[in-house]
Amino acid sequence: MLVAARTHDYGKQPIDSLAGLLKSEGIDAAQLVLPKGFTEIGSYDEVTPEIIERIRANFEKEGIKIHILGCYMDLGNPDDDVRKQAVDTFKKCLAFNKTLGASIVGSETAYPRLNDEEKKIWHPYMMDSIARLVEEAERLDVDMAVEPVYWHPLKDLETAAMVFEKMNSSHLKMIFDPANVLEHPEIDQD
């Protein structure tokens, strides 16, 4: 069994220290979100191939597997500029993953909490973004994943199944946190 952690739960750490900290805590694998994980990275625009290589080398040295490279973007946003930036950033992370070797690059499909009408409006934009990203993942031969969240256009497992059927790609995976598809996850489910 591997013990994994979200690296940003440890706060932002120096690139040369994070993997060692995880190892000292008994962590074997990680979900890594670059701007949330490292003091040297304020945004994806600051990430260079040299930084990616430093991260890879430090995690490899400590024996920590990067299972998920998180790149949480607003993939369904109807604003063309916002969505283009989101897709371009996710594509960068797909390319970074060739070096980092994470199992998947993952994202939710929106930032804000959307009502049912907004989810319907955002849905075709989300589909367009996912199609572009699947094409890039296939080109690079890496895997990507989307995560259903009740408040987002990818709101439930039925919608996820429809997306997977439409995309029909072995490079598209799913991150599933059951609490994220509940309208009120704080309610006792017993």
Protein language model features and the residues they cover:
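Residue-level "edge-of-site" marker
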Residues: 9, 35, 72, 110, ...
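Glycoside hydrolase catalytic-domain groove-lining segments
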Residues: 185-190
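Glycine-rich, proline-tolerant flexible connector loops at the mouths of alpha/beta enzymes
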Residues: 31-56, 109-117
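Hydrophobic faces of well-ordered beta-strands that scaffold small-molecule active sites
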Residues: 3-7, 28-32, 66-71, 105-107, ...
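Catalytic domains of carbohydrate-active enzymes, especially glycoside hydrolases
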Residues: 16-36, 100-101
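Short polar catalytic/cofactor-binding loops
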Residues: 7-14
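N-terminal amphipathic alpha-helix/helix-capping segment at the start of soluble metabolic enzymes
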Residues: 1-3, 59
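Active-site acidic/histidine proton-transfer and metal-coordination neighborhood
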Residues: 16-20, 53-54, 58-62, 75-176, ...
